[in-house]
Amino acid sequence: MTRLVLASGSRWRRQLLDRLELPYAWAAPDIDETPHPRESPQALVHRLALGKATALAGEYPDHLIIGSDQVCLFDDQILGKPGDAATARANLQRFSGQRVRFLTGIAVIDTAHARHWVDHERYDVIFRDLSETEIAHYVDREQPLDSAGSFRMEGLGITLFERLEGRDPNTLIGLPLIRLCEMLREAGLDPLG
């Protein structure tokens, strides 16, 4: 049986992968996530997703290793995780009534056969008009300081949106399951057996 590894320390990504009911291990890779000068958002998420999976390749021979990474784009700028409540509030104030794009890179490497697949999924969030009070209450309650976009889709973040647009809502949480299943089938592992 093919052995599967998730290259992530994120409990949200593990919860998503659990939905496929496949046995897997997980480990948090340690890579430099700094964007390169003039690197496009697509190139960045491809590089980081593949880099996370590759970082674990030596520890997991004969495995399929999944890596993913996400960026938030607003006004043609890549926004990182807010890190503090003031930045999270400022981001959400900027997003009020606006469209924000998320790109999630996904990579699968097959260490047994020295091959890999890399892609990304796009997902757009259209925020409703938000009051300063709503933003303050949301940030105080959810503390989305380590989340791209300054919100958590898997929590109260859903209350901030007017609508969502994209192929796979799991993309917004950080692991596009539809594309992952396609990649796993290409690698010879059908989640349905």
Curated annotation (Swiss-Prot):
Coiled-coil regions listed: none
Gene3D superfamilies: 3.90.950.10
Record carries keyword Hydrolase: yes
Protein name according to UniProt: 7-methyl-GTP pyrophosphatase
NCBIfam families membership: maf (TIGR00172)
Lineage: Bacteria, Pseudomonadati, Pseudomonadota, Gammaproteobacteria, Oceanospirillales
PANTHER family registered for this protein in UniProt: 7-METHYL-GTP PYROPHOSPHATASE, BIFUNCTIONAL DTTP/UTP PYROPHOSPHATASE/METHYLTRANSFERASE PROTEIN-RELATED
Keywords assigned: Cytoplasm, Hydrolase, Nucleotide metabolism
Reactions catalysed, as given in the entry: N(7)-methyl-GTP + H2O = N(7)-methyl-GMP + diphosphate + H(+)
